[in-house]
Amino acid sequence: MTNIRKSHPLIKIVNESFIDLPAPSNISAWWNFGSLLGVCLILQILTGLFLAMHYTSDTATAFSSVTHICRDVNHGWMIRYMHANGASMFFICLFMHVGRGMYYGSYTFMETWNIGILLLFTVMATAFMGYVLPWGQMSFWGATVITNLLSAIPYIGTNLVEWIWGGFSVDKATLTRFFAFHFILPFIICALAAVHLLFLHETGSNNPSGISSDSDKIPFHPYYTIKDILGLLIMLMMLMTLVLFSPDLLGDPDNYTPANPLNTPPHIKPEWYFLFAYAILRSIPNKLGGVLALVLSIMILAIVPLLHTSNQRGMMFRPLSQCLFWLLVADLLILTWIGGQPVEYPFIAIGQLASILYFLIILIFMPISGTIENQLLKW
């Protein structure tokens, strides 16, 4: 009799994806983030489900319902902060995962990469709408500012914004629909993640050397299951340290003030994981130009595979490209810092320089360095 693991129609799929999957023998800890993202997603769906049981998506009661969760619901404070800080962990893992893909040339798996970009956009949309739900000052004004960006679209912009708002300002209708979307999107993310894995398993994983590992594969279980569990424990330890010791470290104090359309906060800024894109948006004085730069700052990932000029897949043996990659990382950190600063000298100039450098590195410097390295190998 054959093993049920290999014969049962449903269990067979799980077996071929997580147990008997042939994996490269040399993938490093940078390959842990895929599974960590899966865990983050499950954690967010579960904590979100329990929060939704007590939350009311009405402008009159949303803020007090979140307060009620924190004060009166059993372990409500912990569920709320696990959800809020879980989003931060989600984005840390996302950035690491995308960075790994760029460093090791995983973007040559075009379908997997493009589904990944779609996932990134969907997660960003979900996080943005989730930030609006507590209905604090920064929730309200963040929603107003970001949705207002769509009014920069010629001809249909204003109508589009009012259609999304469900009125002439961010109000009850906006909050209700944002809650509905925030609830449904994680399940769409689940479906996209399954497609992402499907495409990945068509080709098999990349590895640090960038060379085909078909001749040297090991089973996913037990080798990488145990390795993933280590990564998971480290991540959960970091998350729970944040939740139990300084849950508001990454939040904005303004969000503890109920939303007031008559009083604008001095500095409107999104959560930390959007600050790099926000800095790029603000660095362009023109509204439409800023919106285009904002979208392009993420969409640029879609053309990264087309800009690959090197004969080698990854950057493991390409010191020049490595320098540029880490320059890009430093540049993104500077943009993140600038996004949280007021719009005044010298922050405006720093933000503009960092934004220009961001696009220059990806569009011009990296393809040139690939070509130079090809020439150096010939000599």
Curated annotation (Swiss-Prot):
One Gene Ontology biological process: mitochondrial electron transport, ubiquinol to cytochrome c
This protein's UniProt keywords: Electron transport, Heme, Iron, Membrane, Metal-binding, Mitochondrion, Mitochondrion inner membrane, Respiratory chain, Transmembrane, Transmembrane helix, Transport, Ubiquinone
Family annotation (Pfam families): Cytochrom_B_C (PF00032), Cytochrome_B (PF00033)
InterPro entries, alphabetized: Cyt_b/b6_C (IPR005798), Cyt_b/b6_C_sf (IPR036150), Cyt_b/b6_N (IPR005797), Cytb/b6-like_sf (IPR027387), Cytochrome_b (IPR030689), Cytochrome_b_C_euk/bac (IPR048260), Cytochrome_b_N_euk/bac (IPR048259), Di-haem_cyt_TM (IPR016174)
Annotated GO MF terms: metal ion binding; ubiquinol-cytochrome-c reductase activity
List of residues binding a ubiquinone: 201
Subcellular location: Mitochondrion inner membrane
Bridged cysteine pairs (disulfide): none
Sites where the protein binds heme b b562: 83, 182
Superkingdom classification of source: Eukaryota
Misc remark: Heme 1 (or BL or b562) is low-potential and absorbs at about 562 nm, and heme 2 (or BH or b566) is high-potential and absorbs at about 566 nm.
Family statement: Belongs to the cytochrome b family.
Family annotation (PANTHER family): CYTOCHROME B (PTHR19271:SF16)
Protein's recorded name: Cytochrome b
Organism: Galerella pulverulenta
Gene from which the chain derives: MT-CYB
